[in-house]
Amino acid sequence: MGILHPSYAAVVLLLGALACALVVMVISNQERLTLSTRRIRTTATKFLVTQEGYDYNILNPTPVEYVRSAKNGYAMYSVNMWKDPKVLATMEHDEDVWSICAHEDLPNLDVYFKADKKDEGILDQAITIFSLDCRSIDYESYGVTGFIVAMDKFGNVVNALPHGKGAPGGLTLGRSEGISMYNTTTAILAAVHGGFLWDYVTGELEALPFVADTHSLVYRWDDNKYYGMYSDAESRKTHSPQGMGAFDGNTGANKMDDPAYPGWGYLDDSHLNYLTVDGPFAYGSSRGESTLYKIDMRTNQKVWALGGRDSNFTIYGINGQPYDTKLHKYAPERYPWNHQHKFQHLGMGFYSLFDNNVGDGHEQVPKPWGTSSRNVILYVDEASRQAWEVFSHPTGDNAMSYGGTDLLPSGNVLTTSYVDWVHPADPDHQYHVNIWEVSTATNEVEWRAGFKGFNPVAPENLRDPYPHYFFDPLNPDGHVPTLWNIYTADRAYSTVFALHLCSARGGAAVRFSPFNTVRTQNDAPGVAYLLDPQGQVAAQKPFMYQKAWLDRPEEIEVPPGLARFQLGLNNQWDNPWAQDVDMHTLQACA
C-alpha cells in the first residue's frame, strides 16, 4: 500500500504570492478572477509537450511511488470523449467548455485493465453511471458544464445527459451529486433543481415531484418512498443538509414541507451526506461528526452511533488494534475515520464508507497508513457493540471531498477518488478524478478510469503540478473543487446472474451465488429454476437477492435422474439469465 501524499497546505501558503504554476486562487467579493481572458490560444501540437526528463521542484508536492497505472500486467485504452456525438450534444450549449475544460483533439479518458481481468464475461458487461462536471474558478460562472454518463468498462459512452440546456423535455437538472439505481436501466439523480429518473438505455428523463438535497437520494420499492436529505434554504446556503426523511413516491410529500405528513422525518445539523435504509431503520452518515447513526424510523430515536466522539462501539483497525473512542474533544488523529462520505448499511452485519481522512481546514490527518484517503469495509456486531475493519485500502489520493466504497459481485469495490493536486507529467497522478475497482482480496487495482483536464490558470502548461481546488474564505468549506469532478458512481448489469456454481450435498442440489442487476435498499425478490433438456421447468425456488451484492449462496434441489439442465434466474423487472449445467462435471462445493 505504501506511504502516501503528505499534506501540502503549508507549501501552498508559502507559494501564494509567487508567480509560478502552484497557484492557490483566493476569491473575494471585491476581486473575482475570471478565465474569460485566459482562452486556450494554442494548437493541439503545442499541447503535446514531452513528459520525459521532468524533475519535481523542491517546492512542488511530490507524490511518492505508489503505482496504480499501466505497468506490467496492465492494458490501457485512451478515449476521446469529446469525439463522441452523445457527449458533444450535452456540451453544445456551454460556450466556455472548450476554453476551460476540454480540447477537442486530446483524449481525456484513460481506462486501465489488469490483463488477467479483462475477459470476465458478465462482469465485463457492467455499466458505470456517474455525474462528470467541470467547474471554473470564476464564481460568476462557476459551473461550466456537466453531464450524467453511462459508460461501459472499456470507456465507451452508452449515453449522456446534460446538466443544463439540452436535456429531454426542456428540463434543467443543475449539477448532480448523488446517483443510485431505481431499476435495471434507470438511475435516480439528486440534482440542484430536483430529483430525476433517467433511463440510460432509452434516454427518457422524468422529474420527480419534490426537491431533495444533492448529496443522496435512494428509493425503496417496498413502500414506494424515496429517502434523502432535505433541501431547505439553510441547507442550500451552507451546502450542509439540516435533516433527512422520506418523500412519497407519488406526491413527493415530506415532513419538511408539511410537518403533519405522517411519513418519517429527522432533523440534524451535523452535515449529513448519505442515507441508507433497511426495514424500520435509517442509517445516516454524518460528515460533521465522522459518525454513522442508526435511527429507528418508528420512534425517531437514535439506536447507536458508530465512530466519532459519541461512538457506542469498540472499533478495531485493520491490524486488530482498538481505536481510542473515549474522546472528550475533537482529536481527528485518534478517530478511526474522519469526515467520511457514503457511509452505508450493506446488510449481513457489513457497512462501508469512504474515509476522506480530513480534519480542520480540510487538512489531511496523519495515520499509520499515511495521510491518504481510503476505502473501508466494517463488520459490526451490534449485540456486543464491537466493530472490525475487514478491508482498508488507501487510495493514494488526498480526497478532501466526495467518494464511496461499493461492493461489487466480483468481490471488488467500486470507488471514486478526488485529488487535491494534479501532476500532469506523472502518468499515475495526471488525472483530475478517478473511478476505481479494487480487489478486496489483494488490495490491487483491477480497473481504473482516469479523467484528465487542464490547469485553470495556465491551460497550455502540461508539465507543472497545480491544485485541484481554489481557496474561498467566504465558503464554509474553504477549499472549493475546480475543473473535472465526480461525486460518486453506481453500477448496473443488463441481466441477473449467478457466480460460484458447485454441486452440493453429494449432487442433490446446485449451490450458487445470485446477484441482482442493481443494488437496492432492501433485499429484492428473485426466482431460481431448472430447465430440463426439453425446456420444461423441472424445479423452482423463490429467494431474495442480497441488496448490496454481498455473496450470499442459495441452493436448489436437483430432481433425481436430471444430470444436464439449465440453471435460470429472474428478478422483479424480468431480466432473466440462464447457464448450462452438467452435474457430471460440476465441481463439488468446498
Enumerate the predicted regions with their spans:
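A positional/structural detector of protein chain ends, strongest at the extreme C-terminus
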Residues: M1-L4, A590
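N-terminal signal-anchor transmembrane helix specifying type II single-pass membrane topology
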Residues: I3-R32
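Histidine-/acidic-rich catalytic cores in large beta-rich domains
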Residues: N29, S36-A590
